[in-house]
Amino acid sequence: MGRGRVEMKRIENKINRQVTFSKRRAGLLKKAHEISILCDAEVSLIVFSHKGKLFEYSSESCMEKVLERYERYSYAEKQLKAPDSHVNAQTNWSMEYSRLKAKIELWERNQRHYLGEDLESISIKELQNLEQQLDTSLKHIRSRKNQLMH
């Protein structure tokens, strides 16, 4: 016998809400991974918990590349839909502000990762890339230190 349909409304019980979020988040990440494999689609998923914790998934390429591609696409779409070439300056500034704000958030997240913080939300592939970047940086630092010492 199958389960009944769940009524789409906020779960009032905090513990039940957290358990549901955790289970559904795992299912959502799994579905994102499945569609990327089955359909050879480039998939990125960003989820923030009610406490602001980030959970993300990105197929093959890194999240930054996908977000930059999305920004370029969104900007191009908005330019095509503009009625004339003199689009409202306020809209352009708002778009630029949003784009720069997203970039800053990305840099801040990367900085936290470089400092070893907030690593629970990234995949094994991203952890391997991070480790490789840190190894390369450490080699450069040691090389420079050795130059200065001799």
UniProtKB/Swiss-Prot annotation:
State any GO CC term. nucleus
Which InterPro entries does the protein's record reference? Answer: MADS-box/MEF2_TF (IPR050142), MEF2-like_N (IPR033896), TF_Kbox (IPR002487), TF_MADSbox (IPR002100), TF_MADSbox_sf (IPR036879)
Descriptive protein name: Truncated transcription factor CAULIFLOWER A
Pfam families with a match to the protein in the record: K-box, SRF-TF
Q: Which SUPFAM superfamilies match?
A: SRF-like
Residue spans crossing the bilayer: none
Source taxonomy? Eukaryota, Viridiplantae, Streptophyta, Embryophyta, Tracheophyta
Q: Which residues form the K-box domain?
A: 90-150
Major location category of this protein: nucleus
Q: Does the keyword DNA-binding apply?
A: yes
Q: What else is known?
A: This is a truncated version of CAULIFLOWER that may contribute to the 'cauliflower'-shaped floral meristem (curd). This trait has likely been selected by early farmers during the domestication of modified inflorescence structures.
Q: Where in the cell is it found?
A: Nucleus
- Which of UniProt's keywords are assigned here? Activator, Coiled coil, Developmental protein, Differentiation, DNA-binding, Flowering, Nucleus, Transcription, Transcription regulation
Cite the CDD domains for this sequence.
MADS_MEF2_like
Q: Where is the MADS-box domain?
A: 1-61
Q: Which GO terms describe its biological process?
A: cell differentiation; flower development; positive regulation of transcription by RNA polymerase II
Q: In which tissues is it expressed?
A: Expressed in some of the meristems of arrest-stage cauliflower heads.
Q: How does it assemble?
A: Homodimer capable of binding to CArG-box sequences.
Q: Which GO terms describe its molecular function?
A: DNA-binding transcription factor activity; protein dimerization activity; RNA polymerase II transcription regulatory region sequence-specific DNA binding
Q: Its function?
A: Probable transcription factor that promotes early floral meristem identity in synergy with APETALA1, FRUITFULL and LEAFY. Is required subsequently for the transition of an inflorescence meristem into a floral meristem. Seems to be partially redundant to the function of APETALA1.
